[in-house]
């Protein structure tokens, strides 16, 4: 049986066993396509059911999360934690609170996390979790009660050497605080390393808040350097206006680029003169308002609900909002308008059709598992500080982050070239991430 037939047969089986989970199917299909050339060159990676084991989570947890609102009404949400692979270290990955969360989305995120964490070079496995709870419009007390109920079940399954959750969409510093506080009460011990993204006064790390956005910009900067250019003077569009987008904007402008647009789920803002990051943070983090407020209050900025942020002419696009936000037509528009670099700050924000357009039009593309690995890398640095009862300076931690992102880019570029796909960072990221995990799994036996 040829490698193509082996992969096709396994993927057909995966579709049947995981019906109704399109995001998970999409993530697996992309990786399997890249791995065909590995299996042809190194057939031992097909031994002992390795591919099947890699695509099947070690553990999937689904649990009830009952909570009481401010009016005394009881609500019941569903909680998830997918502990996907621990060959390299304890499961590591965020918690997402959003109405769209279901098992398939958590599995897709957890699967991507395996390769992302592997690429960091740090000893962490892959996992992900969350709930279909919507924190929007909820009071602080309602969010606290939900987090406490969620942790009442989750605490049985996590620990600094077992599984270390963090934040994601809908889970920021406030939620991590409530989750950690309840874990501390349930476990009857102050186990700092059980969660990352903590507050600075109780075990958190400097740069963790900025890390995903900063890391994405460090990665795309390396992509640009590889073409003999500089990020300085480039025009950039950034989708989203949350944590990742905000700090990507901040770092890009620090390095001399001009960010000409950002967005949220309601619309997008054109900022031809650049973004006032302090104003954006005040609107989103303090007032928790829509991006339209930015356009109302900042001269030269305009708010739009028609069209798409991807319609703007730019040199670099950084999708930093959510999965599958950038489709094939958007990609064609970017290419027609002169975009030359795309790096994913979010998890799988580009559809397969968009990625294919990037390849066809020679747009250098940094996939999320590489470009947005700065967040989990700095989470692992937070774990190091917790384990040694230490606290590092902002400058030192940021330097570590820069080195990690440069090494990730170098690894992706060298691996892509080794397998005959020069400058295809998707192939490079998938193969490099896979080989490290696969070697560990083969060494540890069939478990």
From Swiss-Prot:
<dbReference type="InterPro" id="IPR036291">
    <property type="entry name" value="NAD(P)-bd_dom_sf"/>
</dbReference>
<dbReference type="Pfam" id="PF02812">
    <property type="entry name" value="ELFV_dehydrog_N"/>
</dbReference>
<feature type="binding site">
    <location>
        <position position="92"/>
    </location>
    <ligand>
        <name>substrate</name>
    </ligand>
</feature>
<feature type="site" description="Important for catalysis">
    <location>
        <position position="168"/>
    </location>
</feature>
<feature type="binding site">
    <location>
        <position position="113"/>
    </location>
    <ligand>
        <name>substrate</name>
    </ligand>
</feature>
<dbReference type="GO" id="GO:0006537">
    <property type="term" value="P:glutamate biosynthetic process"/>
</dbReference>
<comment type="subunit">
    <text>Homohexamer.</text>
</comment>
<dbReference type="GO" id="GO:0005737">
    <property type="term" value="C:cytoplasm"/>
</dbReference>
<feature type="binding site">
    <location>
        <position position="212"/>
    </location>
    <ligand>
        <name>NADP(+)</name>
    </ligand>
</feature>
<dbReference type="GO" id="GO:0004354">
    <property type="term" value="F:glutamate dehydrogenase (NADP+) activity"/>
</dbReference>
<dbReference type="InterPro" id="IPR046346">
    <property type="entry name" value="Aminoacid_DH-like_N_sf"/>
</dbReference>
<feature type="active site" description="Proton donor">
    <location>
        <position position="128"/>
    </location>
</feature>
<dbReference type="InterPro" id="IPR050724">
    <property type="entry name" value="Glu_Leu_Phe_Val_DH"/>
</dbReference>
<comment type="function">
    <text>Catalyzes the reversible oxidative deamination of glutamate to alpha-ketoglutarate and ammonia.</text>
</comment>
<dbReference type="InterPro" id="IPR033524">
    <property type="entry name" value="Glu/Leu/Phe/Val_DH_AS"/>
</dbReference>
<comment type="similarity">
    <text>Belongs to the Glu/Leu/Phe/Val dehydrogenases family.</text>
</comment>
<dbReference type="InterPro" id="IPR006097">
    <property type="entry name" value="Glu/Leu/Phe/Val/Trp_DH_dimer"/>
</dbReference>
<feature type="binding site">
    <location>
        <position position="167"/>
    </location>
    <ligand>
        <name>substrate</name>
    </ligand>
</feature>
<keyword id="KW-0560">Oxidoreductase</keyword>
<dbReference type="Pfam" id="PF00208">
    <property type="entry name" value="ELFV_dehydrog"/>
</dbReference>
<dbReference type="InterPro" id="IPR006095">
    <property type="entry name" value="Glu/Leu/Phe/Val/Trp_DH"/>
</dbReference>
<dbReference type="GO" id="GO:0005829">
    <property type="term" value="C:cytosol"/>
</dbReference>
<dbReference type="InterPro" id="IPR006096">
    <property type="entry name" value="Glu/Leu/Phe/Val/Trp_DH_C"/>
</dbReference>
<protein>
    <recommendedName>
        <fullName>NADP-specific glutamate dehydrogenase</fullName>
        <ecNumber>1.4.1.4</ecNumber>
    </recommendedName>
</protein>
<feature type="binding site">
    <location>
        <position position="379"/>
    </location>
    <ligand>
        <name>substrate</name>
    </ligand>
</feature>
<feature type="binding site">
    <location>
        <position position="243"/>
    </location>
    <ligand>
        <name>NADP(+)</name>
    </ligand>
</feature>
<dbReference type="InterPro" id="IPR033922">
    <property type="entry name" value="NAD_bind_Glu_DH"/>
</dbReference>
<dbReference type="InterPro" id="IPR014362">
    <property type="entry name" value="Glu_DH"/>
</dbReference>
<keyword id="KW-0521">NADP</keyword>
<feature type="binding site">
    <location>
        <position position="116"/>
    </location>
    <ligand>
        <name>substrate</name>
    </ligand>
</feature>
